[in-house]
């Protein structure tokens, strides 16, 4: 594990900080960085619409049950990723930005290299893969988490939401779907404003919390 002060970057505590492990849904921190990079450059807008592909719909694990052909705004999909850790929403955004998840993942690895994340390699954009070539470390998680919350503090507006409804509009009709934050710590009496939790059977990593 590792504890890093977000604003200036000093490491306060570390143990096995450079041990490679599977990041599971913590992968989505880098996915969010690339989404906000695109927003920052102006190539993406919050009210842009994104169409769900068959590949995005097929994602298992944590999902918000997007249907093939379903259209949602970028902001709604960001909420689906940040609040509910939606794998389907992550893939939909990856495909929208780069044309394919594979190309998006290439950019994820380039971004990680640019941040000096020396022990990280991504194979997908949501963390579902069981590939041994999909790995990171506590130190690298701290580096990318710091990049996200210091460069794009707007993320805290989404990560502090406990519950919110989205509307599915498909050929089957319209229905409400409730998003519930996967980070249960935001309901505790102390303030924890941001994190990305991740868990699969072979994962022993937890993203550090950002408390105020």
Where are the regions a protein language model picked out?
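Active-site-adjacent loops and short helices of periplasmic peptidoglycan-processing enzymes
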Residues: 1-139, 145, 149-150
């Amino acid at each position: 594990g590792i504890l890093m002060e977000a604003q200036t970057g000093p490491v306060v505590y570390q143990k096995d900080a450079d041990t490679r492990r599977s990041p599971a849904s913590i992968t989505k921190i880098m996915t969010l960085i690339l989404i906000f990079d695109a927003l920052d450059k102006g190539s993406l807008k919050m009210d842009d619409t994104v169409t769900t592909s068959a590949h995005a719909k097929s994602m298992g694990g944590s999902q918000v049950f997007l249907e093939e052909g379903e259209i949602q705004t970028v902001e709604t999909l960001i909420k689906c990723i940040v609040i509910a850790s939606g794998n389907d929403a992550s893939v939909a955004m990856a495909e929208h930005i780069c044309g394919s998840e594979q190309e998006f993942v290439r950019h994820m690895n380039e971004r990680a290299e640019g941040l000096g994340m020396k022990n990280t390699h991504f194979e997908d954009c949501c963390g579902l893969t069981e590939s041994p070539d999909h790995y990171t470390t506590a130190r690298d998680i701290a580096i990318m988490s710091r990049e996200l919350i210091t460069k794009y503090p707007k993320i805290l507006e989404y990560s502090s939401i406990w519950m919110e409804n989205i509307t599915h509009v498909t050929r089957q009709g319209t229905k409400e779907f409730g998003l519930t934050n996967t980070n249960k710590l935001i309901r505790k009496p102390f303030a924890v404003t941001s994190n990305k939790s991740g868990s699969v059977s072979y994962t022993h990593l937890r993203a550090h919390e950002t408390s105020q």
